[in-house]
Amino acid sequence: MQGAFLNNRIILQSYHIKKRLYSKRTSSLHSRFLQPTYRKNICQISKPIFQQDLSTNTNFISKLKSPFSNLKMSNLKQPLVWIDCEMTGLEVGKHVLMEVAAIITDGNLRPVEEKFDAVIKLDEKQLSEMNDWCIEQHGKSGLTERCRQSNLTVKDVENQLLAYIKKYIPKKREALIAGNSVHADVRFLSVEMPKIIEHLHYRIIDVSTIKELAKRWCPDIPAYDKKGDHRALSDILESIGELQHYRSYWLS
């Protein structure tokens, strides 16, 4: 009798273990089993929100058209400060910041009403340090000429950006920095705009890391289409859209 009881108990435990393992596996890899049409529709939910052409924006702090533009400061939970910089190159100390943009979102990627974008005044000596890629790309986008015409110093931009961040996130070390390969931006900001780095948390959310993990662990997830015009504000919008893309397919 006791043997039969133990045998039944073992069978029951085995059933529950298998059920747990199966449920966990199915949940974590649910995106692999979605029908192609359904998966496509999931991604389309977020793309129109952020894929806006803002490369011609000339305002320092301006409105961001979004279904979530009424997000209030009191509702900003787990805030993220999305930052993107354009530089004359990638060598800190030799190259300098050209443009800095930022958008603040909550933890669910809903942006606040305002966005930040500023171009820094550079002299010809600083511009002459650009490599061939930067000369071509920033010349084509019009950023080089805007740096010549700008009247904002790097300290002007630092103070204005800090004011923008503090308006929504007054507490230090609360908001994480987010972006694509944002560690490169952080290196330049640490030197040229240390007040920004001091106010934000040391942890970062790097969308490029998630992209690389998705390629290795869920290679069937389609790539996120990016315009890639290498202007700071439009790059941020694409980064937010890209993270929404991976969240919809994989991380939900």
Curated annotation (Swiss-Prot):
Keywords: Cytoplasm, Exonuclease, Hydrolase, Nuclease, Nucleus. The active site is at residue 202. Its EC number is 3.1.15.-. One of its GO terms (cellular component) is mitochondrion. It is found in: Cytoplasm; Nucleus. GO terms for biological process: rRNA processing. InterPro entries: Exonuclease_RNaseT/DNA_pol3, Oligoribonuclease, RNaseH-like_sf, RNaseH_sf. Residues 81-241 form the Exonuclease domain. Disulfide bonds: none annotated. It holds the Pfam family RNase_T. Belongs to the oligoribonuclease family. This is Probable oligoribonuclease. It comes from Schizosaccharomyces pombe (strain 972 / ATCC 24843) (Fission yeast). The gene is rex2.
